[in-house]
């Protein structure tokens, strides 16, 4: 029986880090065996590639220095000639002879030595570049069988082998979304103003989760500036009593602040669990774990004590572990009893270890929002990662580098995703409570949800759908229509903005005692919507347990050929 994870930090250090390395190594070795790569031949080709790159860099460096010398000598030739022409009547004959000699010698050296040398070096550069292109083409050809074997699910398969009770869906299904709505109270209003960039759904300990990145537009402001210089004359009296007229000038400045659409992308982990079903709280990082002696810790502790004594503002009661209360700080919670059941002493201990560790984990870097049975983790370390998992990132022409990149990239992904789950794994009750569907099993209706449709549209790119006049990012939304042959037609609407240049005059008081209209140009952003269509078909074939990667890719090829579609991504074939 698989044991639950109650101390995610220790489990990662002692078990999962090395276990994932082993799984990653075995996965790459299996892919390489299937590809039947001649590793030694590729290494020899790559050695020649890198040797020629080094020679090419040296040749380019020499071309640079010879070019500098060429420019200097031409300046001497031209400069000497100009000096002779300008000073032939003023300079003594010996100075003119010296200038002439410098020009002539420079010209001779240019024509006899520098230009031929530059020509030889450029010819050598072109020859090496041609050889390098052929060698790289050969190396890519040697690696082509392996590059073809990478697919969209390679990381999720490795993670499921590494972490017990972690399962990933082939794509975000309508059943998974309906389960989140009906069983856990998920509210689709979250998606109203957002577009899904990518999503990965599944189960951990039988409870549903979604890792998603969304794009949202918020109307902010932008300030534009303009200026106008004014001139006037004044009559002044000097120290001797004489009156005279002087010219004055001043530059007047003005600004206009106008609405400006701003786009933000955020990555979240959404998790459903029926434990503590009425509990609501929100916490954000404060960096106070392990900082008991700091002034801020003492101040926050004092404020929590004061809030606990103030019964008018609610029934907040502090746990006996005050260090945890200050560091995790969920004083906005609505149910002390359910909170205490959820965050047991074991959970508090594991959470404190997680918050303090910045060597293996990421420390206190996450927001934790619990809205009854929906939990949302937004970790800072996830925001800069592209978790679309496009297999092209593994492809390369150098076997050894491809192997290194495969392990490095997937280790980064696993580390980041694992510690996004870690705050949830700290809570024993989240692992002890499982829904009926997870205990008894439930057949899933394999139809893709609108989350997956939006992610597919964003993968194809905004340029396929945006309005011709759109100058901003777009929020892509989709509508589906089932076709008679089992495929689905998606209508994609791209909501963006066009800009119109405006001119506004702002009245400013000048030093001449008058008001002046200062022009300020600014952009007005007006909404536009573009449209496009995607034809798609889900691949619901049940995969055999011991299927090889070649068999998997042959199956994908058959799907694309039969459906006349162009792209296979995450078990969905599609074309624009």
PLM regions: where:
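Acidic, low-complexity intrinsically disordered regions
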Residues: 70, 87-95, 182, 295, ...
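A residue-identity detector for tryptophan
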Residues: 65-66, 74, 91, 140, ...
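N-terminal topogenic membrane-targeting module
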Residues: 35, 42, 112-226
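Basic, amphipathic N-terminal segments
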Residues: 1-64, 132-164
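Transmembrane alpha-helical hairpins and terminal membrane-anchor modules
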Residues: 58-135
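Charged, long alpha-helical assembly modules
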Residues: 444-576
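Structured extramembrane domains adjacent to transmembrane segments
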Residues: 176-507
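Generic surface-pattern signal
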Residues: 51-61, 68, 137-140, 144, ...
């Amino acid at each position: 029986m698989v044991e639950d994870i109650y101390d995610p930090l220790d489990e990662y250090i002692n078990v999962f880090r090395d276990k994932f390395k082993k799984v990653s190594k075995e996965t790459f070795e299996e892919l390489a065996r299937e590809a039947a790569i001649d590793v030694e031949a590729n290494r020899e080709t790559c050695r020649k590639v890198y040797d020629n790159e080094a020679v090419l860099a040296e040749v380019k460096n020499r071309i640079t220095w010879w070019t500098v010398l060429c420019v200097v000598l031409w300046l001497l030739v031209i400069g000497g000639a100009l000096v002779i022409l300008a000073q032939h009547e003023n300079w003594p004959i010996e100075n003119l002879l010296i200038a002439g000699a410098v020009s002539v010698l420079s010209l001779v050296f240019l024509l006899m030595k520098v230009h031929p040398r530059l020509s030889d070096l450029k010819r050598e550069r072109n020859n090496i570049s041609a050889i390098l292109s052929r060698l790289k083409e050969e190396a890519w050809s040697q690696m082509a069988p392996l590059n073809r074997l990478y697919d969209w699910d390679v990381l999720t398969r490795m993670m499921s082998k590494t972490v017990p009770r972690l399962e990933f869906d082939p794509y975000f299904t309508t059943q998974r979304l309906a389960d989140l709505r009906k069983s856990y109270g998920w509210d689709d209003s979250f998606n109203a103003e957002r577009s899904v960039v990518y999503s990965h759904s599944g189960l951990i300990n039988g409870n549903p989760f979604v890792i998603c990145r969304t794009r949202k537009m918020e109307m902010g402001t932008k300030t534009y500036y303009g200026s106008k210089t004014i001139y006037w004359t004044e009559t002044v009296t000097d120290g001797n009593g004489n009156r005279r007229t002087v010219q004055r000038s001043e530059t007047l400045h003005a600004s206009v602040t106008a609405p400006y659409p701003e786009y933000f992308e955020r990555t979240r982990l959404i998790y459903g669990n029926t434990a503590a079903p009425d509990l609501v709280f929100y916490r954000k990082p404060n960096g106070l774990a392990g900082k008991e002696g700091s002034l801020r810790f003492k101040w926050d502790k004092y404020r929590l004590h004061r809030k606990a004594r103030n019964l008018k503002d609610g029934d907040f009661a502090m746990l006996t572990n005050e260090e945890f209360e200050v560091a995790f700080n969920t004083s906005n919670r609505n149910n002390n009893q359910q909170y205490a059941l959820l965050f047991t002493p074991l959970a508090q201990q594991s959470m404190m270890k997680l918050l303090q560790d910045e060597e293996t984990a990421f420390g206190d870097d996450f927001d934790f929002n619990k809205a009854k049975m929906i939990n949302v983790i937004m970790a800072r370390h996830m925001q800069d990662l592209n978790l679309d998992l496009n297999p092209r990132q593994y492809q390369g022409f150098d076997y050894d580098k491809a192997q290194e990149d495969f392990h490095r990239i997937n280790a980064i992904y696993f580390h980041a995703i694992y510690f996004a789950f870690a705050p949830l794994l700290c809570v024993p009750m989240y692992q002890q409570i499982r829904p009926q569907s997870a205990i008894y099993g439930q057949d899933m209706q394999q139809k893709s949800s609108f989350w997956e449709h939006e992610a597919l549209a964003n993968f194809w790119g905004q340029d396929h759908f945006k309005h011709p006049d759109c100058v901003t990012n777009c929020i892509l939304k989709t509508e589906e229509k089932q076709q008679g042959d089992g495929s689905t037609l998606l209508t994609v609407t791209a909501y963006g903005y066009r800009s119109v240049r405006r001119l506004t005059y702002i009245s400013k008081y000048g030093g001449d005692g008058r008001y002046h209209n200062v022009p300020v140009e600014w952009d007005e952003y007006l909404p536009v919507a573009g449209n496009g269509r995607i034809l798609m078909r889900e691949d619901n074939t049940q995969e055999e347990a011991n299927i090889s990667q070649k068999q998997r890719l042959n199956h994908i090829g058959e799907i694309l050929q039969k459906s006349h579609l162009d792209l296979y991504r995450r078990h969905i074939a599609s074309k624009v």
